[in-house]
């Protein structure tokens, strides 16, 4: 199944993309996945004349469940996500495209007015999505304790809400929740996979 010439082609049927396709990825607003999905929509679907909308979910697994419901539903997943290996193995999914989209800047963020010092890294618990945590190891050389959440945006929100003091998050989430970077690390070079609904054929 591929997007081609204003239709979605499968072995058995062609679906008109004038019906609107949905790009699913990890939310909430402010995630690097949202950033990549918007980039994909701008640089691929719009240029192809494809009508599309973005839908954000709490997990990539929830995105995949939506994709399995319709050939008009797609999911974008970063290759840094450990669970992506399971998606490649599924016979009911199909890898349609791989593209590069570097993430926004990542760094350590705190609430305005919070007095941060570097020695806090020796004892503080940092809230983060699992995928980027090695940034702290490589840039600070410290063995840090983490409180893991579903997304970088969720990490930033926990700091905004006063549930945590320091988040490893990206620039979009930092801006969204009004936080302040006390350290910046890098924009992560990243590749992404686009999955669509596969076709299972009985081999018996």
UniProtKB/Swiss-Prot annotation:
GO molecular function: carboxy-lyase activity
Cell location: Cytoplasm
Highest taxon of the lineage: Bacteria
Listed EC numbers: 4.1.1.100
Pathway recorded for this protein: Antibiotic biosynthesis; bacilysin biosynthesis
Keywords attached to this entry: Antibiotic biosynthesis, Cytoplasm, Lyase
GO biological process: antibiotic biosynthetic process
Catalysed reactions listed for this entry: prephenate + H(+) = 3-[(4R)-4-hydroxycyclohexa-1,5-dien-1-yl]-2-oxopropanoate + CO2
Main location: cytoplasm
Gene Ontology cellular component annotations, sorted alphabetically: cytoplasm
Stated family: Belongs to the prephenate decarboxylase family.
Purpose of the protein: Part of the bacABCDEF operon responsible for the biosynthesis of the nonribosomally synthesized dipeptide antibiotic bacilysin, composed of L-alanine and L-anticapsin. Bacilysin is an irreversible inactivator of the glutaminase domain of glucosamine synthetase. BacA is an unusual prephenate decarboxylase that avoids the typical aromatization of the cyclohexadienol ring of prephenate.
Name of the featured protein: Prephenate decarboxylase
